[in-house]
Amino acid sequence: MAQHYRVGRLEQEIEREVNDILLKRVRDPRVAGVTITGVTVTGDLQQATIYYSILSDKASDGEKTAAGLAKATGLIRSELGSRLSIYKTPELTFERDNSVQYGSRIDELINNLKRQD
C-alpha cells in the first residue's frame, strides 16, 4: 500500500521537474511549446512514461517535437537524477497526449453548432 503512494508522489515530482527542465535547461527550439500533461511510473520505479502535448496541429511539428524530446532525453534524465532522491533514475519514454487537441476540436464543433442555430 505504501508503495502505491510512493509511485504517485514520484509521478508528480517527475512531472514538475521535467516541466522545469524543459523551460530552463533544454534550449532546443523543437521542444519550446511542449507541456507535460502526465507521468506514469512502473511499480518497480524503473521506467517512466511522460505524456506531453503541443498546441500545433501540424504532423510535421509533432514529428519535430518527438525528435527534439528524443534527443533531450539524456539531459532530462541526468537532471532528474541530480534533483530526485531515489536510488536509480527511471528510463524515460515520451508519448504525445492528444487529449488537448481532441478537447479543442470538440469545443470547435460545439461553437459551430451554436452559430448555426
UniProtKB/Swiss-Prot annotation:
InterPro entries documented for this protein: KH_dom-like_a/b, RbfA, RbfA_dom_sf, Ribosome-bd_factorA_CS
GO biological process, one term: maturation of SSU-rRNA
Subcellular location per the Swiss-Prot or TrEMBL entry: Cytoplasm
Keywords: Cytoplasm, Ribosome biogenesis
Plastid recorded as keyword: no
GO molecular function, one term: ribosomal small subunit binding
Predominant location: cytoplasm
Superkingdom assignment: Bacteria
GO cellular component: cytosol
Function: One of several proteins that assist in the late maturation steps of the functional core of the 30S ribosomal subunit. Associates with free 30S ribosomal subunits (but not with 30S subunits that are part of 70S ribosomes or polysomes). Required for efficient processing of 16S rRNA. May interact with the 5'-terminal helix region of 16S rRNA.
Subunit structure: Monomer. Binds 30S ribosomal subunits, but not 50S ribosomal subunits or 70S ribosomes.
Membership in a protein family: Belongs to the RbfA family.
Protein name: Ribosome-binding factor A
Organism of origin: Lactiplantibacillus plantarum (strain ATCC BAA-793 / NCIMB 8826 / WCFS1) (Lactobacillus plantarum)
Gene designation: rbfA
